[in-house]
From Swiss-Prot:
The active site is at R183 (proton acceptor), D469 (proton donor). Belongs to the malate synthase family. Its EC number is 2.3.3.9. This is Malate synthase, glyoxysomal.
């Protein structure tokens, strides 16, 4: 992968390299040794990961080069669009394999990181599905990744528990739990704690490989009714990337001796190029697919990134870029039509609100916003939706149940053939709205706070009554970068000033003072707010836009992470 050069052998501590771990030839573990971790990182599991890495690394490298080539085209004025070469796939009649009975009903799904208490609460939440996240809701330090694998194994085994010493309460699984999906990292992210043949492993192959190796048999027996495990696949930009996943699944099934098509996955459509590839993505995964999901926050981030060299496509304040914008509604409608035509789920987007326990009026206002958003989704034809907090499950469930009745989904009842005429212009239409100083301030304040939390090991962060993950920081970063690069006028609040480095510097200074007031001096001093501020500011003011904030930040947690947390 093209992004791996920064994680060279000289850049990582050699202390304890593979010490204590029984590793196969060509595999080197750079994370600290732990007896519990060693049970996950046994020789057989590492052989499985090494086989996946060696089999698919050249395909992955080629796909990442294709991403860079597409970026060059867009930066030279090109636009993403439907591929004429695959028109036959879009136009012909075919369907994906039938949806497994275990996941026919997905009307509300909850998401969260692979932390022990979170897993128990999410599985007990009353949602139909829990998506356990190794990606945007997790800071991928060594402890988080390995403990996440241990937690998931215990969850699949049914033995997971958690003793909250502060509340003196023990958490255990209920008799009835949500179905478990797991989201590995995207293709672009390395796993720099594990080297295979002298280069960092591919992060998603480590996440997928360890989880599948240790859990496929128990999962199929206890959760999947003969199917599974189930996955969510993030950040893809082209069907060639889905084809790699399909090949990974087939190889894993063959090595495990289970039936082809057992593994099932939902793909997040969260990049602008992927919206033109939805039929092709489903086609590549047709034996392993259980639908597509509207990853709307990352989709907005991708819109800015794709059009970084297009000054005629500037975004308004990000709070104005909702699902009522024409390009967002078109994306949602086409996703529903595509999925239902191919016989799989069309999943709606995230409700990120957190219950406001100390303000009932504000809480009801927030819940009403959630209900309206979910009503729009179910009436449009979505088969289910996402929530970030257990407190939102009843409201979301009520809306979907009231409109779907006893049907587990709307795959056959909401064809959305009216969306067949949506054009490239519909999907690329510039969003409307104003740009304000408050928009610039909010981006800066939220971006710095999220990054500070990420650097200290937290990937899902409550900020201003919303559960934020990496997507929020990415939108904030790229929008600030876009406004700075093109010197946009803040036309929405009567100020009429243009964004430049001097103005941005003042905003950063003032927002850091506000953050210190809000979190308190002691927490501010102990946290990594200053480091996060430097990194976020550098990213916003760089002459060229980095593809992912987390790639830059990952370099920091692998090499410089506090010793008591990472033990590198």
């Amino acid at each position: 992968m093209g992004s791996l050069g920064m994680y060279s052998e000289s850049g990582l501590t050699k202390k304890g390299s593979s010490r204590g771990y029984d590793v196969p030839e060509g595999v080197d573990i750079r994370g600290r040794y732990d007896e519990e971790f060693a049970k996950i990182l046994n020789k057989e599991a590492l052989l499985f990961i090494a086989d996946l890495q060696r089999t698919f690394r050249n395909h992955i490298k080629y796909s990442m080069e294709c991403r860079r080539e597409a970026k060059r085209r867009y930066n030279e004025g090109g636009l993403p669009g439907f591929d004429p070469a695959t028109k036959y796939i879009r136009d012909s009649e075919w369907t994906c394999a039938p949806v497994p009975p275990a996941v026919a009903d997905r009307r509300v799904e909850i998401t969260g990181p692979v932390e022990r208490k979170m897993i128990i609460n999410a599985l007990n939440s009353g949602a139909k599905v829990f998506m356990a996240d190794f990606e945007d809701a997790l800071s991928p330090n060594w402890e988080n990744l390995m403990r996440g694998q241990i937690n998931l194994k215990d969850a699949v085994d049914g033995t997971i528990s958690f003793h909250d010493r502060v509340r003196n309460r023990v958490y255990k699984l209920n008799d009835r739990t949500a179905k478990l999906f797991v989201r590995p990292r995207g293709w672009h992210l390395p796993e720099a704690h594990i080297f295979i043949d002298g280069e960092p492993a591919t992060g998603c192959l480590v996440d997928f490989g360890l989880y599948f190796f240790h859990n496929h048999a128990n999962f199929r027996r206890s959760q999947g009714q003969g199917y599974g495990p189930f996955f969510y696949l993030p950040k893809m930009e082209h069907s060639r990337e889905a084809k790699i996943w399909n090949s990974v699944f087939e190889r894993a099934e063959k090595m495990a001796g289970i039936e082809r098509g057992s593994i099932r996955a939902t793909v997040l459509i969260e990049t602008l190029p992927a919206v033109f590839q939805m039929n092709e993505i489903l086609y590549e995964l047709r034996d392993h697919s259980v639908g597509l999901n509207c990853g709307r926050w990352d989709y907005i981030f991708s819109y800015v990134k794709t059009f970084q060299a297009h000054p005629d496509r500037l975004l308004p304040d990000r709070v104005l870029v909702g699902m009522t914008q024409h390009f967002m509604r078109s994306y949602s409608d086409l996703l529903i039509r595509t999925c239902h035509r191919r016989g799989v789920h069309a999943m709606g987007g995230m409700a990120a609100q957190i219950p406001i326990r100390d303000d009932p009026k504000a809480n009801e206002v927030a819940l009403e916003l959630v209900r309206k958003d979910k009503l729009r989704e179910v009436k449009a034809g979505h088969d289910g939706t996402w929530a970030a907090h257990p407190g939102l499950i009843p409201a979301c469930m009520e809306v979907f149940t009231n409109n779907m009745g006893n049907a587990p989904n709307q795959i056959r009842s909401m064809r959305r053939d009216d969306a067949a005429n949506l054009t490239e212009e519909d999907l690329l239409q510039q969003p409307r709205g104003v740009r304000t100083m408050e928009g610039l301030r909010l981006n800066t304040r939220v971006g710095i706070q999220y990054l500070a939390a990420w650097l200290t090991g937290a990937g899902s962060v409550p900020l201003y009554n919303l559960a934020e993950d990496a997507a929020t920081a990415e939108i904030s970063r790229v929008q600030n970068w876009q406004w700075l690069k093109y010197g946009v006028e803040l036309d929405g609040d009567g100020l009429g000033v243009r964004v430049n480095k001097e103005l941005f510097g003042r905003v950063v200074e003032e927002e850091m003072e506000r953050i210190e007031r809000e979190v308190g001096k002691e927490r501010f001093k102990k946290g990594m707010y200053k480091e996060a501020c430097k990194m976020f500011t550098r990213q916003c003011t760089a002459p060229n836009l980095d593809d992912f904030l987390t790639l830059d930040a990952y370099n920091y947690i692998v090499i410089h992470h506090p010793r008591e947390l990472s033990k590198l």
